[in-house]
A protein has these predicted regions:
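Phosphate/nucleotide-binding beta-alpha loop and adjacent structural elements of enzyme active sites
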Residues: 1-256
């Protein structure tokens, strides 16, 4: 669902991105765009790791983007940084994601040599990132998980060891886990001396509800919000928390 703030709110945007991973097509149709009568949407990134954004996106060199969930596809983040020269804060405690971030830096430092990139890489990944020239001085990696409080939690792995994603939600994946530090968006902002978030992107495998609810409770309202609602998509939401959060965004917090 893509909606637009009114003139009073300086035409800030909210983009709630409902889409499927694992090779399925992203859930965003022309009918939805026409239904909400909004700006044209464009997809930024690879077929797998890309996200839909409004064509008239307002970001610049002063903008701050928080990207929760990195995995092994940074195409969206790299494209945003290259295009808008904005600051990107990448947040993901997954070991494979940390390695991928290091690999991508090596890729650009070594004349874009694709052989330095390890892991399960999408077939269109190199074609997407090769023409770009991101500024890694404006990219910060935060090696913790996003949650509703500052603590340590089990970070469950998938049963297929080739898959990169892990989750803080029990029963979503397998029983094997790492133990990771987690923190709130507010605390991470304070640690990085940020007073605002211009765009928040979340693909955090079921933790999105607690994270966003706490963010709103802390009076933090990003101009653009992109969320993959994994708790709902993976049928792990018997209490309808996803629906409640979307209703809060639309009706209480006045995202439109």
């Amino acid at each position: 669902v893509y909606k637009l703030h009114d003139e009073i709110n300086k035409k800030d945007y909210t983009l709630m991105n409902l889409h499927f991973q694992g090779g399925a097509k992203r859930f965003m149709t022309n009918e939805l765009v026409q239904f909400f009568n909004q700006d044209k949407l464009i997809k930024i990134g690879t077929d797998y790791g890309g996200w839909w954004i409004p064509e008239s996106l307002h970001l610049d060199e002063t903008s701050v983007v928080y990207s929760g969930g990195v995995g092994q596809d940074m195409s969206f983040d790299i494209l945003l940084q290259h295009k808008y020269n904005c600051q990107i804060v990448l947040i993901d405690p997954t070991k494979k994601a940390i390695q991928h971030f290091n690999d991508i830096q090596s890729y650009y430092k070594n004349n874009k040599n694709p052989y330095v990139i390890t892991g399960n890489i999408q077939k269109d990944y190199i074609d997407v990132i090769q023409p770009l020239d991101p500024n890694f001085n404006k990219m910060t990696y935060v090696n913790i998980g996003l949650w509703k409080e500052c603590t340590t939690l089990k970070f469950f792995k998938q049963t297929n060891e080739n898959h990169v994603s892990q989750t803080l939600v029990e029963t979503m994946f397998g029983n094997s886990y790492d133990v990771v530090n987690v923190n709130t968006i507010k605390n991470i902002m304070q640690e990085n001396n940020h007073t605002k978030i211009d765009m928040l992107k979340l693909d955090i495998e079921g933790a999105e509800i607690e994270v966003v609810e706490r963010m709103f409770d802390d009076n933090i309202y990003p101009s653009y919000v992109l969320i993959e609602f994994d708790l709902y998509l993976k049928k792990k939401d018997p209490m309808n928390k996803t629906k409640a959060l979307i209703e809060r965004m639309l009706f209480k917090e006045q995202y439109k």
